[in-house]
């Protein structure tokens, strides 16, 4: 599933081509996504100028003059900026049509994504209860320490809770906990403030590196230019169960936490 870095890479890739342009409408070939596409999407966006493209967690938000288009890439979605006349491929479900023969095309084979019209994005149920951004100022060691006090939930599940912090999915939770030397099974309430300081720095370092390298392509994700993300070449633990730890050489261990594959080093992570 595309996580924060992949959504940010997408935003950075499409923003220069579309910001400030006027929409001419939309083509919805299949509205049956995880959340159905609005029946009146074309009418709502037609004639409006795209003022800004921003990201909130794993959501991409296209702010128009009146209202916002929310896009979630789901498990397998990606976006491309193309000529409106570009051949339509299987699973090209939605086109947002812009002036000068451009379109933003949403491709989603597994249809777990979303393209929604929001009248008031900041107060929409999908967004209003989200935690802070991991690359923002609110996200810090003291914040995590206070939110984790007396909680027995494994720190990996705690870190992946979008009400605590947004956008840290399975890949980057694994990598951040390894970088911080914290056992993913450890209860969130049993981590001291200095260790949370290491974790916050690790999360930021890992996410920033992933964005710089174009995200992580494991199967479905491609950048808006059609290329792959190369952070997968830097993965220290994710997908490496049984292989030697890059720090100590011990075999990496695998366990499921919250139903998600979790890889860690029993020697380096405590």
Swiss-Prot record:
Listed cofactors: Zn(2+)
Record has DNA damage as a keyword: yes
Binding positions (DNA): 91, 110, 151
Keywords per UniProt: DNA damage, DNA repair, DNA-binding, Glycosidase, Hydrolase, Lyase, Metal-binding, Multifunctional enzyme, Zinc, Zinc-finger
EC number: 3.2.2.23, 4.2.99.18
Zinc-finger ranges (FPG-type): 236-270
Regions that span the bilayer: none
An annotated GO BP: base-excision repair
GO molecular function, one term: zinc ion binding
Keyword DNA damage carried by entry: yes
Annotated cofactor note: Binds 1 zinc ion per subunit.
Catalysis: reaction(s): Hydrolysis of DNA containing ring-opened 7-methylguanine residues, releasing 2,6-diamino-4-hydroxy-5-(N-methyl)formamidopyrimidine; 2'-deoxyribonucleotide-(2'-deoxyribose 5'-phosphate)-2'-deoxyribonucleotide-DNA = a 3'-end 2'-deoxyribonucleotide-(2,3-dehydro-2,3-deoxyribose 5'-phosphate)-DNA + a 5'-end 5'-phospho-2'-deoxyribonucleoside-DNA + H(+)
HAMAP family reported in the protein's UniProt record: Fapy_DNA_glycosyl (MF_00103)
Family: Belongs to the FPG family.
NCBIfam families, per database record: fpg, PRK01103.1
Self-association state and partner proteins as the record states: Monomer.
UniProt-recorded name of the protein: Formamidopyrimidine-DNA glycosylase
């Amino acid at each position: 599933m595309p996580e924060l870095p992949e959504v940010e890479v997408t935003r950075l890739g499409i923003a220069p081509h579309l910001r400030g342009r006027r929409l001419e409408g939309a083509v919805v070939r299949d509205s049956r996504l995880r959340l159905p596409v609005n029946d009146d999407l074309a009418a709502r966006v037609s004639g409006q100028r795209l003022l800004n493209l921003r990201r909130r967690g794993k959501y991409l938000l296209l702010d128009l003059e009146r209202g916002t288009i929310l896009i979630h890439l789901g498990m397998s979605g990606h976006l491309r900026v193309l000529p409106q006349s570009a051949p339509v491929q299987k699973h090209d479900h939605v086109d947002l049509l812009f002036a000068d023969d451009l379109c933003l095309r949403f491709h989603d084979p597994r249809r777990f994504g979303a393209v929604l019209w929001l009248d008031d994005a900041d107060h929409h149920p999908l967004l209003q209860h989200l935690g802070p951004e991991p690359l923002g100022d609110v996200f810090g060691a003291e914040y995590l320490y206070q939110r984790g006090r007396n909680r027995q939930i494994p720190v990996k599940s705690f870190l992946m809770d979008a009400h605590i912090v947004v956008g840290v999915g399975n890949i980057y939770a694994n990598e951040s906990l390894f970088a911080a030397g914290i056992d993913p099974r450890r209860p969130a309430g049993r981590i001291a403030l200095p260790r949370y300081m290491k974790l916050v720095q690790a999360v930021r370092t890992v996410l920033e590196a992933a964005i710089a390298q174009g995200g992580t392509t494991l199967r479905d994700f491609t950048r808006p230019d059609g290329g792959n993300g190369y952070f997968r070449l830097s993965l220290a633990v994710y997908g490496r169960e049984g292989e030697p730890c890059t720090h100590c050489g011990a075999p990496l261990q695998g366990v499921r936490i919250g139903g998600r594959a979790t890889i860690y080093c029993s020697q380096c992570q405590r």
